[in-house]
């Protein structure tokens, strides 16, 4: 279980670009520093719903799964050298630049307004401009966790 945290620490120091194989299709639940992480690839429709609800039309981000911090459940993604969370209501939180130091205390609720990039269906994967292509096959906020 700590291998995914070590992988994220490594990617923070190098690059998240083309890290699709590092994200598991199976749900991995980890409690780390008072936060509950569920790492997996959510369905594409869920990702679009949460990102568009938050006004995020960005083609260079990596969706990692979900995180719960202080009873606030968010979709977790890495964008612009930081971890971010977006709630089901569309509130966006910049959580921090290290998986070991994520916090709502130092967070500014932001809206990201970048140019919308058309959705492409590329080699049976769901992609934005062919970045971070995933085959989303899970549900997102299940009631089972």
UniProtKB/Swiss-Prot annotation:
One Pfam family hit: Pox_A31
Superkingdom of the source species: Viruses
Protein family: Belongs to the orthopoxvirus OPG159 protein family.
Protein name according to UniProt: Protein OPG159
Provenance organism: Monkeypox virus
């Amino acid at each position: 279980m700590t291998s995914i945290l070590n992988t994220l620490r490594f990617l923070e120091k190098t690059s998240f670009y083309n890290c699709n194989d590092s994200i598991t299709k199976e749900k991995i639940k980890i409690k780390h520093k008072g936060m509950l992480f569920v790492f997996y690839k959510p369905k594409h429709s869920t990702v679009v719903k949460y990102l568009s609800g938050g006004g995020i039309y960005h083609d260079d981000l990596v969706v990692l799964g979900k995180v719960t911090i202080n009873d606030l459940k968010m979709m977790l993604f890495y964008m612009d050298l930081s971890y971010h969370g977006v709630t089901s209501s569309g509130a966006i939180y910049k959580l921090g630049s290290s998986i070991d130091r994520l916090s709502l205390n130092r967070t500014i609720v932001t809206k990201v307004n970048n140019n919308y990039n058309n959705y492409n269906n590329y080699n049976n994967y769901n992609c934005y401009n062919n970045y971070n292509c995933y085959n989303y096959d899970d549900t997102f906020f299940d009631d089972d966790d």
